[in-house]
């Protein structure tokens, strides 16, 4: 049987990237992409080992962001990021601070939370 030589993939370096933070009331998702929007690494608070009501805390969001930042720095050599925040969750500020404390340079922070301009009709009010 003939031995097949495998050529290792060249390690791509992305010095600049975009961090998408989606903070819901129950969870926080952190997605690191390149400038074109291709996902490089992603994580969530639940994937970092938090469960239940601890998932919605700012501390948990900071830990998830720290995990994503270390992953992006080690695997892709990322140094400069731009942050895009979506959602009304509590973990957004802690996640941004975690990226800064890991040694990444944050160039811009944009809040792109979708706000309805009197869109769909709300559910009826609860009468207790």
From Swiss-Prot:
Pfam families: Ribosomal_S11
Keywords in alphabetical order: Ribonucleoprotein, Ribosomal protein, RNA-binding, rRNA-binding
GO annotations of cellular component type: ribonucleoprotein complex; ribosome
Claim: Ribonucleoprotein is one of the keywords in the record: yes
Molecular-function annotations in GO: rRNA binding; structural constituent of ribosome
Record InterPro entries: Ribosomal_uS11 (IPR001971), Ribosomal_uS11_bac-type (IPR019981), Ribosomal_uS11_sf (IPR036967)
SUPFAM superfamilies per the UniProt record, alphabetical: Translational machinery components
GO biological process, any: translation
HAMAP family: Ribosomal_uS11
Role this protein plays: Located on the platform of the 30S subunit, it bridges several disparate RNA helices of the 16S rRNA. Forms part of the Shine-Dalgarno cleft in the 70S ribosome.
Subunit annotation: Part of the 30S ribosomal subunit. Interacts with proteins S7 and S18. Binds to IF-3.
Protein name: Small ribosomal subunit protein uS11
């Amino acid at each position: 049987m003939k031995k097949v030589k495998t050529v290792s993939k060249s390690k791509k370096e992305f010095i600049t990237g975009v961090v998408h933070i989606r903070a819901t009331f129950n969870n926080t998702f952190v997605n690191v992409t390149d400038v074109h929007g291709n996902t490089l690494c992603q994580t969530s608070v639940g994937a970092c080992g938090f469960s239940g009501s601890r998932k919605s805390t700012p501390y948990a969001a900071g830990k998830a962001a720290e995990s994503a930042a270390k992953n992006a720095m080690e695997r892709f050599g990322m140094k400069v990021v731009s942050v895009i925040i979506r959602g009304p969750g509590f973990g957004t500020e802690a996640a941004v601070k975690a990226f800064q404390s890991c040694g990444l340079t944050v160039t811009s922070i944009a809040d792109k939370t979708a706000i309805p301009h009197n869109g769909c009709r709300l559910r009826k009010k609860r009468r207790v």
